[in-house]
Design a protein with these regions (language model features):
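Short acidic-glycine loop/turn motifs at beta-strand connectors
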Residues: 208-212, 224, 268-271, 370-372
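ATP-binding N-terminal substructure of ATP-dependent carboxylate-amine bond-forming enzymes
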Residues: 1-110, 114, 137, 387, ...
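Peripheral (often C-terminal) accessory segments that flank ATP-dependent C-N-forming ligase machineries
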Residues: 303-396
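Active-site "cap" helix and flanking loop/linker of ATP-utilizing ligase/carboxylase catalytic domains
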Residues: 243-264, 269-270, 279-331
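Active-site nucleotide/adenylate-binding loops and adjacent lid/helix of ATP-dependent enzymes
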Residues: 15, 108-203, 207-252, 384
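ATP-dependent carboxylate/acyl-activation modules
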Residues: 4, 216, 222-224, 270, ...
Length: 396
């Protein structure tokens, strides 16, 4: 039990990273009477609009991060992004602060190398063949060993930034430059993956609570340039594929430990299920659960990290999501077409409230429910096509 926000008996959640996923986490926490603090590197981030208060700091600056957390003294520290000084989280955890799911999990998943080595080399789980490279010369060697096409990604990036397909050896320099441009924290290390021919990509939302591990129905998704553009639930897959996916997801999340929801990304191939990545937090493709499940991924995350039981997840209806992305740049913009999109049956729109636009930035999603996935996908994409981000040259 705990008291109201701002009281001596309040429970406090501090969010590191305040994007659209964090916004929904804050909303769910407030429904349970939790005091909320949103933190990000820029002002007016989406979650800051709904949190009780907010702070703007460089989250890669360990001293600034530690000073803020010691000042706020939260009951739980909830990372929403990878670009955080994770060694500081390790130190704070040693001081007695609770990091979700654990400081070790945050450190391992902050970049693609840590989690890939854990999954493939320590746990022996099936993955695409891969190499790491610290220079253009090493990248060319990796491309030679893996063959083309292959996929080049920065060790640390989000939403597909810096990711490219190397289709011939001569593309290596362009891929290297794209990776450097898209990397977070000025990283210069990349992972090179053998190209995987897959039937589909899925996210298996895996919930670790005080009562054990449960799985949400699988979510299918399509990515473009490494970033998701639509997702749907449930994804149709065989019982054997689902069992294999759940085995992989449980192995990875058990090793990471802690409480909360994990977005485990997997490839379904004719050779079996391959592990791709894991995020120890709600997943962008999982926003569809706001339309499909009795408890969304955000509600599940908050319940589990606060120590409440999570006994089951029920799929209420098939559903789908589709994204709205910006084309231009600027702070003076408007999203149009909301009335048209909301006129479609069983359809919702979530406008994230980001303070500025840039090409490819995700600004909103549509959510549609229907009697089957195919109809839900059609409606969600139709609704998204009705929305536009209009950028103005001058403040309107």
């Amino acid at each position: 039990m705990w008291g109201a926000p701002f009281s001596a008996q309040s429970r406090k959640l501090l969010l590191l990273g305040s994007g659209e996923l964090g916004k929904e986490v804050i909303i769910e926490a407030q429904r349970l009477g939790v005091e909320t603090v949103a933190v990000d590197r820029y002002s007016n981030a989406p979650a800051m609009g709904v949190a009780h208060r907010s702070h703007v700091i460089d989250m890669l600056d360990a001293e600034s991060l530690k000073a803020l957390i010691r000042l706020e003294k939260p009951d739980v520290i909830v990372p929403e992004i990878e670009a955080i000084a994770t060694q500081a989280l390790v130190e704070l955890e040693e001081e007695g602060f609770v990091v979700i799911p654990t400081a070790r999990a945050a450190r391992l998943t902050m970049d693609r190398e840590g989690i890939r080595r854990l999954a493939a080399e320590e746990l022996g789980l099936p993955t695409a063949d891969y190499r790491f490279a610290d220079s253009l010369e090493e990248l060319r060697q990796a491309v030679s060993e893996l063959g083309t096409p292959c996929v080049v990604k920065p060790i640390m990036s989000s939403s597909g930034k810096g990711q490219s397909v190397c289709r011939k050896p001569e593309d290596a320099e362009d891929c290297w430059n794209q990776a450097l441009d898209g990397a977070r924290a000025k990283g210069t290390r990349v992972i090179v993956e053998a190209f995987v021919t897959f039937e589909s990509e899925i996210t298996l939302l895996t919930v670790r609570s005080v009562e054990g591990t449960i799985f949400c129905p699988p979510i299918g998704h399509i990515q473009k340039d490494g970033d998701y553009v639509e997702s749907w639930q449930p994804h149709n897959m065989s019982a054997s594929q689902l069992a294999e996916a759940q085995f992989i997801a449980k192995a990875v999340t058990d090793e990471l430990g802690g409480l909360g929801i994990f977005g485990v990304e997997l490839f379904l191939t004719d050779q079996g299920v391959l592990f791709s990545e894991v995020s120890p937090r709600p997943h962008d493709t999982g926003m569809v659960t706001m339309a499909t499940q009795d408890l969304s991924q955000f509600a599940l995350h908050v319940r589990s990290i606060l120590g409440f039981p999570v006994q089951s997840v029920n799929l209420l209806t098939p559903g789908a999501s589709a994204t709205l992305k910006a084309i231009g740049n600027g702070q003076a913009f408007a999203i149009t077409g909301l009335g048209e999109a909301l006129s479609l049956p069983r359809t919702q729109v979530r406008v994230f409230g980001k303070p500025e636009v840039r090409p490819g930035r995700r600004m909103a999603i549509t959510l549609s429910a229907a009697e089957n996935v195919e109809n839900a996908r059609t409606t969600a994409k139709q609704a998204a096509s009705m929305l536009k981000v209009e950028v103005y040259e001058d403040e309107q």
